[in-house]
């Protein structure tokens, strides 16, 4: 897909990719040993003058949890299972990263891809997420590939129109269907939550009959803490 086609979704006035730019612009920002070692560091990607800078910088994470039957007391925690794929700050860097990513249909079940603003980790406990929530839509697998691409491009292009309120988007590959989620900062801001929901429905062209579920991170954290307390007493 060309950058011009991407502009249809998020209104960037970007010319066709020129020779010498594009994928090469993201080579130093994809998943590599430096990213693995410095995953907690807020490293701002360098944007050369000829590239088209995004409003925000982003990082992409991958995680995969084992099936329930394989879970044990020694299973790696969620935070440790997150693997940094790369960081992007321009249109060219994004396409350089995206063209090397596995498509949803190629990912095994229980895999997740997380595209978040740089500095925000895809965890409930992150300070930017702890008071927020997410909208979740369930899709047939045949719909997921296009919907995930549209969702990423809409986030990069500020099509949700809520500015810093938006934290990230998540693809969750499951056995029978897939889930897409949009995370935002403030669950108590009902107006902001409604704007995110309405934008999600518009971006994915979801009919009114398709349900979108809301989950507040605080509720999930409290439930998780209760479960941990019960396990500690058992």
Question: Which residues does each predicted region cover?
Answer:
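ADP-ribose/nucleotidyl-moiety interaction motifs
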Residues: 2-234
């Amino acid at each position: 897909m060309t950058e011009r086609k991407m502009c249809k979704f998020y209104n960037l006035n970007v010319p066709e990719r020129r020779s010498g730019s594009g994928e090469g612009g993201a080579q130093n920002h994809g998943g590599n040993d430096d990213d693995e070692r410095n995953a907690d560091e807020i490293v701002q990607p360098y944007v050369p003058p000829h590239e088209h800078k995004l409003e925000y910088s982003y990082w992409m994470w991958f995680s995969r949890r084992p099936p329930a039957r394989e879970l044990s007391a020694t299973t790696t925690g969620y935070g440790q299972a997150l693997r940094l794929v790369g960081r992007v700050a321009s249109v060219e860097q994004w396409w350089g990263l995206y063209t090397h990513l596995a498509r949803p249909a190629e990912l095994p079940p229980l895999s997740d891809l997380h595209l978040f603003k740089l500095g925000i980790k895809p965890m409930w406990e992150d300070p930017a997420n702890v008071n927020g929530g997410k909208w979740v839509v369930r899709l047939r697998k045949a719909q997921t590939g296009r919907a995930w691409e549209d969702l990423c491009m809409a986030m990069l292009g500020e099509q949700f129109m809520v500015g810093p309120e938006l934290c990230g988007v998540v693809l969750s590959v499951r056995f029978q269907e897939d889930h897409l989620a949009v995370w935002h900062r403030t669950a108590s801001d009902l107006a902001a939550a409604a704007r995110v929901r309405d934008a999600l429905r518009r971006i994915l062209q979801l009919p009114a009959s398709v349900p979108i579920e809301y989950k507040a991170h605080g509720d999930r954290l409290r439930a998780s803490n209760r479960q941990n307390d019960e396990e500690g007493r058992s």
